[in-house]
Structures are given as C-alpha cells and as structure tokens.
Amino acid sequence: MGKTQPLPILITGGGRRIGLALAWHFINQKQPVIVSYRTHYPAIDGLINAGAQCIQADFSTNDGVMAFADEVLKTTHGLRAILHNASAWIAEKPGAPLADVLACMMQIHVNTPYLLNHALERLLRGHGHAASDIIHFTDYVVERGSDKHVAYAASKAALDNMTRSFARKLAPEVKVNSIAPSLILFNEHDDAEYRQQALNKSLMKTAPGEKEVIDLVDYLLTSCFVTGRSFPLDGGRHLR
C-alpha cells in the first residue's frame, strides 16, 4: 500500500518574510502547504510552482475571512496545523482616525484567527491525541506594551489570551500555543543606525533570522504535551 499523504499545514500571510520561510521549510520536507496571501508577490509564483496551494485572501472584513475559510474547506478534508502569521503594524500617528487604527488591528490579529479557528476546527479534529496544532504569532510587546503602537500591542495581547482559551477548548486533540517574537530579521530599507539601535535592545544583540522561528515551530509541532503556552523569541530583551 502507498504511503498516506500528510495533511497540509495552513499558513496565513505566507507570501513574504517569516511566513514565506516557513512555507519553504515545509515544502522542502515534502509537507503539503496551504498559504494565504494578500498581495501577489513574485514569491507566490515560486510557491505555486513548488506545489503549494496559494489562496488570495482579504482579512480586512469578516466576510473576507469566511470566504477564505470556505476555500480551505473546499481544498482539504483535514489540516495538520494552522499557523496564524498574517499581521499588520499601524502606529497612532497625528491625524490618524484612532477608531480605525484599533479596528484594523483587532480585525487582523483577533477577528481573523478567532473566526478561522472556529470555522476550520473540524479539519483539525479527528486525527488523534495531540495530532494537530494551532500556533498564534503574537509579539514581545504583549508583556511590555507600546506607547507608539497601542492598538497593535492590545490586539496582540488579545491574541495571546485567546491562545489559552482555544487550548482549553480543543484539547487533547489540538495543541494551541503562541510565539512572541521581537526583532527576528530586518527590512531591506533599514539603515545602519536603525539596525544598531534595534540590536542593542536585546542581550544577544543579533537578528537571528527565520531559522530561529522555524526551529521553535518544529518543536511545537512535534511535542505531544505542550499547549496553552507562549514562547518568547526576544534574545533576552526583557532583561535590558
């Protein structure tokens, strides 16, 4: 008899940076992947050519979230994991409509994972004890707060709390954890002065790159016991 095909891992926001690195990591392991993307970056074509199922999604509305969930339900009978990586980062700038800033942050970081976890729950269940995972990507600012990104920090804190609620709801079939990164990698346009200032905020004084996230995700996926926990990736920044 042939080997059973693994269930796919769903990655939201998989078209660039950490989401893209995770998608390629799993593809290289012959692990099927479903990726959501908002903007069609050239990297999406590479994922499609490698066999990934890429679905364009608009998470700015609940209707858009549910339309994406419907597409996933049509695509697969089960999921190995959901990695909630889709994110936005908006500051409270002078003149910015504050209610809109808060609504946007809550929509992408709270409404979207909340609705998807419920809509796709049946795809995660039925595969055995601790056989499925949900991983929320939160942020270092969940514990510290942020004076320049108040709505962002609040929405990520809500997602962090939701990790524990879904862990209680879905155990023991599904493990639910969160990863709280600070600086992982720089943007191409970041200048040398900014990079040095950012590096000095942590004890380790380095931007570790995507592999640090990938290694932690692999650990969480292979664990049969860890659930309802948040895992900081901050290089000791909390001790500065």
Curated annotation (Swiss-Prot):
Family under the similarity heading: Belongs to the short-chain dehydrogenases/reductases (SDR) family. FolM subfamily.
State what protein this is by name.
Dihydromonapterin reductase
List UniProt keywords, sorted A-Z.
Answer: NADP, One-carbon metabolism, Oxidoreductase
Under the heading CDD domains, the entry gives: PR_SDR_c (cd05357)
Q: What does the record give as EC number?
A: 1.5.1.50, 1.5.1.3
- Which top EC class is named for this enzyme in its record? oxidoreductase
Cystine links in this protein are none
Q: Which reaction does it catalyse?
A: (6S)-5,6,7,8-tetrahydrofolate + NADP(+) = 7,8-dihydrofolate + NADPH + H(+); 7,8-dihydromonapterin + NADPH + H(+) = 5,6,7,8-tetrahydromonapterin + NADP(+)
Per the record, the GO terms for biological process are: one-carbon metabolic process
Q: What's this chain's function?
A: Catalyzes the reduction of dihydromonapterin to tetrahydromonapterin. Also has lower activity with dihydrofolate.
Among its keywords, does the record have Oxidoreductase? yes
Active-site feature positions:
Y152 (proton acceptor)
Could you name the domain of life of the organism this protein comes from? Bacteria
Task: State which residue ranges cross the membrane.
Answer: none
Q: Which InterPro entries match?
A: NAD(P)-bd_dom_sf (IPR036291), Sc_DH/Rdtase_CS (IPR020904), SDR_fam (IPR002347)
Gene Ontology terms for molecular function: dihydrofolate reductase activity
A Pfam family cross-referenced in the UniProt record is: adh_short_C2
